[in-house]
């Protein structure tokens, strides 16, 4: 079906690669450029803005400073860059074959973060967080994970910096994605299903709801409880917080350089959104241009209709976890007691969102859409059969939106440029694809 256009396609660049020495050396902090400050996190004991000292039991000082920093750029430590060089800069692809099948005048580009050792964008922050913890004498990290991308990324990072790693993996994904468990174990991590018998809160949930699928909110509570209870242990979070979003901005910085090589700038930038880190990673560099009046690219968050915090949640203060142990964050939320259905995009089953992403959406600087699981997998299969890469279910939400943007351009004849973040591969999600092909998706 491609024969007639082979010559034309071969003359256009498909893969845009940066040299290692072109890798960004700084993270971009959008807090420096927002028209007004984001609302501060609140201490759950007083409901007053939380002090840095109150966060020290669970986070290292360097990450607390980054969380509250208003500096526009923060230097990436050389030790972190050394590990980044294993896979960064990551490639930017032009989706020629998908464009051909869609017969759209739109140009579609995707940034592929699945080339990292753990197979997703999560390694961009896990390496940084493990490094800063190691520097301050932390010996052990605890964390939650949804589909397992974050848990495996942190396990890898802890292995590099000689830290122990305890992962509380949301129960539904623990059984849906067994090879993510294997990967966590391979890199030296200890992974258990959440809720678990290893914490007081986990035991409470299991007693009250023995058949619960679990949630990221529950897993966060367990990981925080564990960190507080053990010496030389800190908690590590894979999304939501400012410093996590900060570390992901290498994605967008590379995209801008790569698109400049082919004299392109996106009209729309798309990322799936659970906690918001991969969306912020690809989108905030373009938000910066918009705030400076240079360009006006739309930035679109794509979430599952089964967990639609941005599209149907309330913008208010809420806890980041189910047990009410974390600071209160101003964000779009479905409520911290919310337990979403056990969809296959386990990494997007979070009740809230990044305060940065939430503020940008509330002020109209970002927009949000949601899709159901069936139409997301339809897009994933179409992408795999054209571009050859098997996408993670989470990343496939961005693909669905990109395809719809291209089809809309087909209707209007608009020659728009679409950029989306393919945040991870789906090699450990094949059982989910099996469910799709057998008609057994929820």
Curated annotation (Swiss-Prot):
| Reaction catalysis annotation | (1S,2R)-1-C-(indol-3-yl)glycerol 3-phosphate + L-serine = D-glyceraldehyde 3-phosphate + L-tryptophan + H2O
One GO BP: L-tryptophan biosynthetic process
MF term (GO), any: L-serine hydro-lyase (adding indole, L-tryptophan-forming) activity
| Gene3D superfamilies hit by this protein | 3.40.50.1100
Could you tell me the superkingdom of the organism this chain comes from? Archaea
Q: Does the keyword Amino-acid biosynthesis apply?
A: yes
InterPro entries on file: Trp_synth_b-like, Trp_synth_b_CS, Trp_synth_beta, Trp_synth_beta/beta-like, TrpB-like_PALP, TrpB-like_PALP_sf
Which co-factors does it depend on? Answer: pyridoxal 5'-phosphate
Name one matching Pfam family: PALP
What is the E.C. number?
Answer: 4.2.1.20
Keywords, sorted A to Z: Amino-acid biosynthesis, Aromatic amino acid biosynthesis, Lyase, Pyridoxal phosphate, Tryptophan biosynthesis
Give the pathway.
Amino-acid biosynthesis; L-tryptophan biosynthesis; L-tryptophan from chorismate: step 5/5
Q: Which residues carry this modification: N6-(pyridoxal phosphate)lysine?
A: 122
The record's annotation in NCBIfam families points to: PRK12391.1, trpB_rel
Family note = Belongs to the TrpB family.
What functional role does this protein have?
Answer: The beta subunit is responsible for the synthesis of L-tryptophan from indole and L-serine.
Subunit record text: Tetramer of two alpha and two beta chains.
Report what the protein is called.
Answer: Tryptophan synthase beta chain 2
Q: What is the lineage of its organism?
A: Archaea, Methanobacteriati, Methanobacteriota, Stenosarchaea group, Methanomicrobia
